[in-house]
Amino acid sequence: MASPKETLQRRAARVRRQVKAVANGRPRLSVHRSSKNIYAQIIDDVRGVTLAAASTLDGDLKGKLKTGADSAAAAAVGKLVAERAVKAGVKDVVFDRSAFIYHGRVKALAEAAREGGLSF
């Protein structure tokens, strides 16, 4: 039987494989969620560069958030990464939730990024 860590890695690889199959050259919005913070970055896999990034540890958000581990913080990160992506000239992305289910903080980040101008 697979350990929880192996199961997580398998699920992340499966999602990433599906994302790359439908990307068609579009950058991906990659999300990482820890117990205390949430991170998002727009990655261009063709060139291998990060185009925009934001997290709850970011200087622009650090003092404004009550905690980095709630849906409000995730929404703030989503809005900030969308602003930075639009400023960098990126509007169409593919959402890469990694091994996390589309619920709670991950969903809040995605919806805020859509409101901020990203389409996926």
Curated annotation (Swiss-Prot):
Biological process per Gene Ontology, one example term: translation
GO molecular function terms attached to this record: 5S rRNA binding; structural constituent of ribosome
Family indicated by similarity: Belongs to the universal ribosomal protein uL18 family.
GO annotations of cellular component type: cytosolic large ribosomal subunit
Protein name: Large ribosomal subunit protein uL18
Superkingdom field: Bacteria
Function recorded in the entry: This is one of the proteins that bind and probably mediate the attachment of the 5S RNA into the large ribosomal subunit, where it forms part of the central protuberance.
Sorted UniProt keywords: Ribonucleoprotein, Ribosomal protein, RNA-binding, rRNA-binding
InterPro entries, A to Z: Ribosomal_uL18_bac-type, Ribosomal_uL18_bac/euk
Pfam families: Ribosomal_L18p
Quaternary structure and interacting proteins, as annotated: Part of the 50S ribosomal subunit; part of the 5S rRNA/L5/L18/L25 subcomplex. Contacts the 5S and 23S rRNAs.
Entries under HAMAP family matching the protein: Ribosomal_uL18_B
